[in-house]
C-alpha cells in the first residue's frame, strides 16, 4: 500500500490533493474438490452509526485473487468554509485450477466432455467497482476551521460553533454484463437473457448501486461536547431488491470527547 498528499497552505487557506494505491493477494479460503477456493466479500452499510447492516449493498466474488485499489482525494478550506471529496476504484482479478475442477467432475452429472467445454460453461471474469463522495460545510459562527498537518485532515469544531454541511456519496457494487437477465426467484443472472438450468453461469455481479444525499447541522457547545442532526436520502439500484428503492434516515447524535 502507498499514499501521498500534496499541500499548499497560507494563513487562512489550505488546499491538498492526495492519491493512494493498495494491492492485496488473497491466499485464504475453503477447500473444495482438493482445490482452494478463495472469495472476496464486499459490502457497505447505509450512512448511519447505529445499523451496520450490509444486506442492501453487498457482493461475493468467488475465486478472487488479486485486488487493486486506487484512490484520489482533495480538500480545500478557508476560515469559515470547507469542501472535500474522494474517489475510489477497485479492480479484482480471479484465478482457479480449472484442470483439477474439471477432473473432479468427471463421471458426475456435472461432467463435461472437455476442459475447453467446461471453461466455456464456467467462465471466469474480472470485476471493477467505483465509489465517491463530495462534502461541503459552512460555519455560521465559531473559531476558524483548522487543518491537521500530521494527519492531513480537517480538525473538528473547537469551542462554541454552529455549522451546516451537505454531502453526496455514491457506492457502486454493480458490475453487470449487458444482455444478462436477473431472475428474482432464483437470485441469479442468466447469460444472454435466457432462462436455463444447465449451464447457467453468469459473469454479472449485482451488489447494488447507492446514491446518498445528506443535509446536516452541527452545534458545538465547547471542545468536549457536540450535537449533530442530519437527514439522508438514499436511492438504491439493485435487481435483488426491485421494490426497495428509497430510504430515508433521520439521525441525531450527542458526542462527548475528552
Regions found by a protein language model. Name each.
Residues 1-6:
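Short, small-residue-biased leader/transition segments that mark boundaries at the very start
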Residues 20-28:
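Outer-membrane beta-barrel translocator/channel fold
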Residues 16-18:
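Active-site regions of oxyanion-processing enzymes, predominantly non-cytosolic
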Residues 31-258:
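Outer-membrane beta-barrel pore domains
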Residues 7-8, 23:
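Short, well-ordered alpha-helical segments in soluble proteins
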Amino acid at each position: 500500500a502507498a499514499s501521498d498528499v500534496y499541500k499548499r497552505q497560507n494563513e487562512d487557506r489550505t488546499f491538498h490533493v492526495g492519491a493512494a494505491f493498495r494491492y492485496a493477494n488473497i491466499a485464504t479460503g475453503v477447500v473444495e474438490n482438493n482445490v482452494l477456493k478463495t472469495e472476496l466479500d464486499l459490502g457497505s452499510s447505509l450512512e448511519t452509526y447505529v445499523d451496520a447492516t450490509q444486506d442492501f449493498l453487498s457482493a461475493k466474488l468467488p475465486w478472487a485473487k488479486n485486488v487493486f485499489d486506487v484512490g484520489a482525494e482533495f480538500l480545500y478550506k478557508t476560515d469559515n468554509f470547507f469542501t472535500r471529496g474522494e474517489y475510489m476504484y477497485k479492480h479484482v482479478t480471479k484465478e482457479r485450477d480449472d484442470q483439477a475442477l474439471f477432473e473432479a467432475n468427471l463421471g458426475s452429472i456435472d461432467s463435461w466432455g472437455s476442459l475447453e467445454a467446461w471453461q466455456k460453461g464456467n467462465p471466469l471474469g474480472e470485476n471493477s467497482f467505483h465509489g465517491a463522495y463530495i462534502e461541503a460545510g459552512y460555519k455560521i459562527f465559531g473559531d476558524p476551521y483548522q487543518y491537521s498537518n500530521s494527519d492531513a485532515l480537517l480538525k473538528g469544531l473547537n469551542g462554541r460553533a454552529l455549522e451546516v454541511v451537505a454531502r453526496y456519496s455514491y457506492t457502486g457494487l454493480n458490475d453487470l454484463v449487458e444482455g444478462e437477465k436477473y431472475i428474482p426467484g432464483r437470485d441469479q443472472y442468466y447469460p444472454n437473457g435466457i432462462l436455463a438450468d444447465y449451464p447457467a453461469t453468469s459473469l454479472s455481479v449485482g451488489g447494488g448501486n447507492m446514491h446518498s444525499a445528506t443535509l446536516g447541522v452541527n452545534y458545538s457547545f465547547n471542545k468536549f461536547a457536540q450535537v449533530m442532526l442530519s437527514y439522508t436520502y438514499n436511492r438504491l439500484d439493485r435487481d435483488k431488491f426491485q421494490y426497495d428503492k428509497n430510504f430515508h434516515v433521520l439521525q441525531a447524535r450527542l458526542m462527548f470527547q475528552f
